[in-house]
A protein has these predicted regions:
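Short, low-complexity patches enriched in S/T/P/G
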Residues: 1-2
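Glycine-rich, small/hydroxylated-residue low-complexity segments
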Residues: 5-9, 16-469
Length: 469
């Protein structure tokens, strides 16, 4: 009898310990997750977050938040014939987000503090035309496992779906395959690993949709993958975080299409694209470099190679947080007149940024038949000069220095001329690309190429050695 009581008592104690630990772990997981949740919501630009329901249980809790987002209204008719409100008023959306927190220490067969399931329950305020267009689209979901140290390991999913504008041609549609986004974040929020996979996105617009006698459009993107690994120094940084990343894209095509049997014209396509980037920190200054390459078609001209390199240097870490806030607020502005912050707020950020002479360099090149065309540019913002009474924009123009070089082989312009004439016929004035470059006088003509050089320094603009202003 005594042994039975002892065993029973032990079971009760263990059960109470599990219940107590589950409740405590649930609270700890909620605390860590809520902090990150608030930061993410802020970075995404929501105007208001309101918690309307919170139910805490021993083994499971649930929260319902309303996220308010104000968006500018699209041009009239963009969302279907039934949505003809041309009042110009912004669209206010209310997103109902449901979060279910399943407390540890055992959740879904794994040892963890909690698992948090997040889903978008409904959205209020969507114009009727857009609501009909999204009838075959499903809301995104996310599942996050919270470790005992506050680390997070999860996956967000956008299910496959399509968007079809109401009362439109059957070919007017956007469709996509399931997008997955895997993330892993350390307890101190400094180590981050992200992976995005999007197998396919297609978007078709029938000829005539953009206007009478206007061609339609067909866009295809397939095999997009992005991998990011970051080792940060401050969990509040999101604009530039030390680490490295790779991007791969199997295929991207943008074409115009016609109803009269005319062959589709490729505006731009790229295949086998792969790029790598790295962000580094010296302790005070940040820098980044990126390069990518693939095969491409530009204006129906197939290139043997499309290359891209870019670098940013001398970014003072002290400006990251205020600069992030300014960029975020500019992105939220629905009126262009309200997008730029006032000078009193912007000046200290720009002054600190300019003090280290930040520089941006970029090069884009394409090769055809062994000949390479390129655009090569470099911009430097030197320390501001003069007193604070001088307008900030004027000070920046005086210290900004920019150089842009363009080189275009005639072997490439000849191929462009041939392709354009084959697709659209000869220009009414008989003036092809070379002729237009010659008439405009922007580029200098050489025996086998066109060249142009633009320089800006001390508030003066030079084109090919000649002062413009």
């Amino acid at each position: 009898m005594g042994k039975a009581v002892s065993v029973t008592g032990g079971v009760v104690v263990l059960a109470l310990a599990y219940v107590g630990s589950s409740w405590w772990l649930g609270q700890q997981a909620e605390k860590h997750y809520q902090t990150d949740y608030d930061k993410i919501v802020k970075r995404m630009g929501f105007d208001e977050v309101k918690r309307v329901v919170y139910t805490r249980g021993i083994f499971e809790s649930q929260a319902i938040d309303i996220l308010t987002l104000v968006l500018p209204r699209p041009p009239q008719g963009m969302m279907g014939d039934d949505d003809q409100d041309d009042s110009g008023e912004d669209i206010t959306l209310h997103l109902y987000l449901v979060q279910t927190i399943k407390h540890g220490p055992f959740v879904g067969g794994r040892l963890a503090a909690a698992r948090i399931e997040t889903r978008l329950d409904k959205v209020e305020g969507i114009p009727e035309g857009l609501k009909q267009a999204l009838a075959k689209a499903s809301a995104p979901t996310a599942s996050t496992l919270v470790g005992f140290d506050g680390s997070m390991d999860g996956q967000a999913v956008l299910p496959a779906g399509e968007m079809v504008p109401p009362d439109s041609e059957p070919d007017n549609r956007m469709s996509w395959k399931q997008l997955t986004y895997d993330y892993r974040v350390s307890g101190d929020r400094l180590q981050v690993q992200d992976q995005l996979q999007w197998p396919e996105l297609t978007w078709s617009v029938s000829p005539g949709a953009f206007g009478t006698d206007k061609p339609g459009m067909h866009l295809v993107m397939s095999g997009l993958s992005v991998n990011i690994q970051q080792t940060g120094t401050n969990p509040d940084y999101c604009l530039m975080v030390p680490g490295h990343y790779t991007t791969r894209l199997n295929d991207f095509q943008l074409k115009t299409v016609w109803n009269d049997g005319k062959k589709p014209f490729t505006l731009f396509s790229v295949s086998g694209w792969e790029s790598q980037g790295r962000i580094t920190s010296s302790g005070e200054l940040l820098a980044s470099e990126e390069n990518g390459a693939g095969k491409a078609v530009v204006m129906d001209v197939p290139l043997e190679k499309l290359g891209y390199t870019a670098s940013i240097s001398n970014i003072d870490e002290a400006v990251l947080v205020p600069l992030q806030d300014i960029i975020q607020e500019m992105g939220k502005a629905t009126d262009p007149d309200d997008a730029m912050p006032d000078e009193a707020r912007l000046r200290p950020v720009v002054s600190t940024l300019a003090a280290s002479s930040p520089a941006l360099a970029m090069r884009l090149d394409g090769t055809l038949k062994g000949k390479t065309a390129y655009v090569d540019s470099r911009v430097v913002l030197n320390p501001l000069q003069g007193s604070a009474s001088v307008p900030l924009g004027q000070q920046m123009l005086q210290t900004l220095k920019a150089d842009v070089k363009v080189y275009l082989p005639k072997a490439i312009t000849a191929e462009v001329n041939r392709r354009l004439e084959k697709t659209f016929g000869k220009d009414a004035n008989g003036c092809n690309l070379d002729c237009q470059l010659r008439q405009q006088g922007i580029a200098l003509e050489q025996a086998d190429a066109w060249k142009a050089k633009v320089q800006f320094s001390g508030g003066q603009l030079m084109l090919n050695g000649q002062r413009i202003f």
